Amino acid sequence: GGDGRETEPPLATVGKPGTPWVKICDRADKVTDFAVKGDDIYLLTHAPSPRYAVLRTSLAKPDLGSAAAVVAASDQVLFAIAAARDGLYLESRDGAVKRVKRLAWGAKDAAEVKLPIEGAASLMSASPVIGGAILSLAAWTRAREIFAVDAAGEAVNTKLQPLGAFDAPDRLVATEVKVKSHDGAMVPLSIIHRSDVKLDGSNPTLLYGYGAYGITEEPGFGPTRLAWLEKSGVYAVANVRGSGVYGQEWYKAGYKATKPNTWKDLIACAEYLIAQKYTSNAKLGILGGSAGGILVGRAMTERPDLFAAVIPAVGVLDAIRAETTANGVPNIPEFGTVKKEE
């Protein structure tokens, strides 16, 4: 139960039994990933910025207080790092789309790895003694494939995960839009449907959201959605506040006292789908699982007129009593406790 990405990597010398472990960082340093190259360790942290930065410090004498900033925060959210012989590979989020970049050792700026489609590019493996990296690439309309990136930054499909007969339907399209919420925040909304779907308000539509723990809903192909899409259904995914699509700031804007933003964002996305004639309130359903039950449950009680169906899949609907359940205590950091007023 519970969720959190912060880590505390320790250090000890290989081949010297009894060597004391050295703590490189604490959870307060907000480090979520790290990579090692030579005598240096690179730390991905959201301490300097809610959109993350990469710091470098010495393995011999780690000191985050004097660590050098190798990659500064930008509009994109850094999500993962990996060290290879030719450079430091960076996984970053540009809205719902994930990209991979390479910062050659000694260079100031990272170059984007060119991939055949936009979707979710994720680092899988890299080694400081081998050039290049292995990554996966998936999209809303295409299943995951494995690519090898060479030291020159060229990506080649390894064919290690070949597409099946139904893994890349040519009749599906995905559109990325941003929807204005109740307070002006722009919420990323991904809309997937058949290319011949008519925008006449008649399409059955399922709107999915989660909005907790800073978890982002990124592009991914779901074969179980094919029957829905083939029958002219529309599937939409909203990265409401509480997700990590724009980093820690976006996450904290849908957290505890700001939690109402999550369902108000979902309501705004539902209204957008209706206004743009994808569907109507008589044919619109919303789906949220686990913590997403709070999202869809409160959207339902606030705007019952807007939805024809609500699916809380193993959904949390009673946040007040949730901490008394077997899995309740680990989730107190996310939702708070009835024993303490905040």
Which residues does each predicted region cover?
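Structural cue for short, hydrophobic secondary-structure segments
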Residues: Y208-G211, A227, V237
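Short loop/turn segments immediately following beta-strands, especially the blade-tip
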Residues: T13-K16, S58-P62
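Alpha/beta-hydrolase fold active-site loops
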Residues: V187, P204, K283
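Short coil/turn segments that connect the beta-strands within blades of beta-propeller domains
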Residues: D39, R85-D86, I130-G131
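Glycine-rich His-Gly loop
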Residues: H46, A138, Y208-G214, S290
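Active-site-proximal cap/loop segments of hydrolase catalytic domains
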Residues: K231, V237-E342
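Conserved beta-propeller blade signature
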Residues: I41-L43, L88-L90, I134
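Non-catalytic accessory segments flanking enzyme active sites
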Residues: G1-V36, A80, E91, K98, ...
